[in-house]
Amino acid sequence: MKHLIYLIIGIAVTVLFFILSCSDGFNIYEQLFFNQGFNDKMYNLSMYPVIAAITIAVAWGGAAIYYYAINSVKFDRWYHWLAVLGVVAVLAPVVCYIYNDTVFANNGLMYVGESIQFEMQTVLFAVLLYVVASYSMRWWSSNCRHTPLPQ
């Protein structure tokens, strides 16, 4: 029962992140990085929900791959978990940058520098969501449930 509560809390935190990423009044992305023209274009082109969804998918997908696809005794150490975290921290902003660049290019806009700065917070959110996902789903892994910290 305790493990199910962890999963529910993880899902709730992730949904809250998505809601705060898409809201009009308080957008978590705009609170951490604000550039008037850049943020206006991202909002008008409805890019925030897609960026949030990509970040969530990469973070939860990375955790699922580690705990259920890899799930090996040879890879149940904290540094293997940290390596997957590193992959998530690199992959999420790269995919989001490619999406940003494609949408802006299709609309005749160039925000290269702003996009790179913006993706630094994607690194932060991807890492936080990966940790949340890890603690939410690790309990059902047969070999890696003790990673990154023992129970």
Tell where the protein language model's regions lie, with residue ranges.
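Canonical alpha-helical transmembrane segments
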Residues: 49-77
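Alpha-helical transmembrane segments of multipass membrane proteins
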Residues: 13-17, 62, 88-96, 125, ...
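Interfacial non-cytosolic loop connecting adjacent transmembrane helices
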Residues: 27-49, 93-121
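Transmembrane alpha-helical segments of multi-pass membrane proteins
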Residues: 8-12, 65-69, 75-95
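Alpha-helical transmembrane segments of multi-pass membrane proteins, especially transporters
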Residues: 6, 51-52, 80-88, 118, ...
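Membrane-water interface at transmembrane helix exits
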Residues: 18, 22-25, 66-71, 96, ...
